[in-house]
Amino acid sequence: MMKTEPRGPGGPLRSASPHRSAYEAGIQALKPPDAPGPDEAPKAAHHKKYGSNVHRIKSMFLQMGTTTGPPGEAGGASGMAEAPRASDRGVRLSLPRASSLNENVDHSALLKLGTSVSERVSRFDSKPAPSAQPAPPPHPPSRLQETRKLFERSVPAASGGDKEAVARRLLRQERASLQDRKLDVVVRFNGSTEALDKLDADAVSPTVSQLSAVFEKADSRTGLHRAPGPPRAAGAPQVNSKLVTKRSRVFQPPPPPPAPSGDAATEKDRGPGGQQPPQHRVAPARPPPKPREVRKIKPVEVEESGESEAESAPGEVIQAEVTVHAALENGSTTATTASPAPEEPKAEAVPEEEASSSVATLERGVDNGRAPDMAPEEVDESKKEDFSEADLVDVSAYSGLGEDSGGSALEEDDEEDEEDGEPPYEPESGCVEIPGLSEEEDPAPSRKIHFSTAPIQVFSTYSNEDYDRRNEDVDPMAASAEYELEKRVERLELFPVELEKDSEGLGISIIGMGAGADMGLEKLGIFVKTVTEGGAAHRDGRIQVNDLLVEVDGTSLVGVTQSFAASVLRNTKGRVRFMIGRERPGEQSEVAQLIQQTLEQERWQREMMEQRYAQYGEDDEETGEYATDEDEELSPTFPGGEMAIEVFELAENEDALSPVEMEPEKLVHKFKELQIKHAVTEAEIQQLKRKLQSLEQEKGRWRVEKAQLEQSVEENKERMEKLEGYWGEAQSLCQAVDEHLRETQAQYQALERKYSKAKRLIKDYQQKEIEFLKKETAQRRVLEESELARKEEMDKLLDKISELEGNLQTLRNSNST
């Protein structure tokens, strides 16, 4: 279970992750830093303390048992402007293991990290110091130094015998100057055990970036800032700064002067009293190299040993700087200075007295540990061999007494940089331009697309030897969960909602969505799965399905487990304040699709279950078989349908408290978690008791129903026997009716034949009648025509008769006359 803290007005929304720390380190490196002056007061704290895991890690590594030199053997450095006693004391660095509760730690990788860092610091610490400083007496080597020796022996020789001799001389100097010290890098790994490798020759390696990111994150959590000025007075408040910033400048050094040969050059370069100035390093004249990069990593936490803490002043600060000017890979070196040069008075924001004192602090240890038979020429030769492939690195270390508290002034530095108007950071160019595309001979005039012929920039990346990208021990899904959550919350529309919790709860059920859900990581967040109809959320109407729960009563639910979110919702009372995140209109996220698919799958499973129960019920009705008591006890029951329960199963494999973890903050946090678990468990027990009581009542009711059903079965058997007798009588009656039906069908067929015959006769008669009428009409017409002809003939004859009678009369008259 991940620890959640209430989100303040300016606090982060989630805890640190290695990916985001590296990202912030890269962003910080691109900003122009501005070191505050020595008289500036520390910035105000953000009122945020370390988590309990930091104290647990620190206590665990304090018990590893390392030997440090007695406080009396650390001699004071005369002529030093700052930290005269603290610079000689033994310093302790403790490499903590991972801060999460359920992660394994590769201690060998952490020891290798501390060894590589101490080797880099001591490797460049090879300047001669004033001869007046006596060499410290030898001390028994610590465990970290023994581990480093074994690691150095295992590394194969990269060059011939001269290179090995120079390396052995440098190792002797390193052991003599750092026997009573242990370099300690306090790193807070969030489950990431990425391999950190050596510095690259042309650019800062991922090791420097990740260390810077770690310390910047630690400082941003504590909220204090220490100015790299002079140490405070004895009565000043005790502050232990852990701020690490990278300050980079790209500059062109002036051409080196011609170096004289022999002892004359050595004597000329030495200051009064035969001491070589700590800020200058002379090398043979070479052509001016390309612009090189200056990187600062400061301040690294350095804690004093237990014996030195008792006698040191409260406000003493250990301050050290290592300045290494590396030339190109071809072995050329130039004379450079750690103090501000006349040509670049503001190249580094470090006071002159601070640079001189800090450089002299480390030079004294190297001079004390150098073999007496080594000549200055050999030292210069070893410097040439050693610095030919290194970067220009400035390392400052600050330490103060007191509790683990520090601060971050990243935002203040950014504002100061903008006010001062310094030029932005320009990283060293790591790209090569190659010829681009050739111009086309005959491009089509109608074509609207044209290809650029500008040179193509090819950027070089780290090789696998310089940057080990393998990360088998960390789940990438879990490591980027919080980063994904923050990016998702930024894209959502956030709005507050206040609900009044009633006796039935809030009326919502939640679901944790994410690929890492099996490990307790809800990568996509806590979402509203269902809204109970008639509940508080349903009556309010503002909370909908698929909404993201960002906060509940000030408790952030980003990057927490589903069980923790359920316990937070269960323990709310009265008026509950929500911070809801919702997709903007027109957007359909993958989370909404996942929740919709989940609800559809559950609905499908519920329908399949109901169909299965219905099928079982039909089979029971047909066969008359019923489930036994054992089947009833084992079968699932859903008396009230699907219930939206906000209580979820808690993880049982929590880490047990060990003596190392017995700190008040850890115990208080664990006690609160146990209280929440206890309340959740009691609620689950009460709910299970109510379920058990309802199931027992349901079981008794089912038994009564079973007896009633058995009695009804007996009655139904008697009724079935009576129905069988009725069925036999009905069969005989059906046979008689069937015979009568057959007779009726025969009669019907005979009548049908007679009817068809009569129908044919009627048709014949009607046809004959029609023909008779036609004949009668024709004969009547012929008769009428004959009558008309006779009538006309009769009229003609009558006319002739009358005419003849006239003629006859005429003749008679004539005859008479």
From Swiss-Prot:
* Ribonucleoprotein is among the record's keywords: no
Effect noted on mutating S17A: No effect on phosphorylation
Query: Which residue ranges are recorded for the region named Disordered?
Result: 1-93, 117-166, 216-445
Localization (cell): Cytoplasm, Cytoskeleton; Nucleus; Postsynaptic density; Cell junction, Adherens junction
Which stretches are tagged as biased composition: Basic and acidic residues? 290-301
Region annotation Interaction with D(2) dopamine receptor: where it falls in the sequence: 100-371
What outcome is documented for mutating S99A in this protein?
No effect on phosphorylation
Q: Which GO terms describe its cellular component?
A: actin cytoskeleton; adherens junction; cortical actin cytoskeleton; cytoplasm; cytoplasmic side of dendritic spine plasma membrane; dendrite; dendritic spine; dendritic spine head
**Modified residue annotations for Phosphoserine:** S15, S17, S94, S100, S116, S177, S192, S205, S438, S658
Bias (Acidic residues): 410-425
DNA damage is among the record's keywords: no
Single GO molecular function: actin binding
Q: Positions of the region Interaction with ADRA2A, ADRA2B and ADRA2C?
A: 169-255
Q: Name one GO biological process term.
A: response to immobilization stress
Going by the UniProt record, its keywords in alphabetical order are: Actin-binding, Cell junction, Cell membrane, Cell projection, Coiled coil, Cytoplasm, Cytoskeleton, Developmental protein, Differentiation, Membrane, Neurogenesis, Nucleus, Phosphoprotein, Synapse
Q: What is known of its domains?
A: The PP1 binding region is natively unstructured, upon PP1 binding, it acquires structure, blocks a substrate-binding site, and restricts PP1 phosphatase specificity to a subset of substrates.
Q: What is this protein called?
A: Neurabin-2
Origin species, per record, is Rattus norvegicus
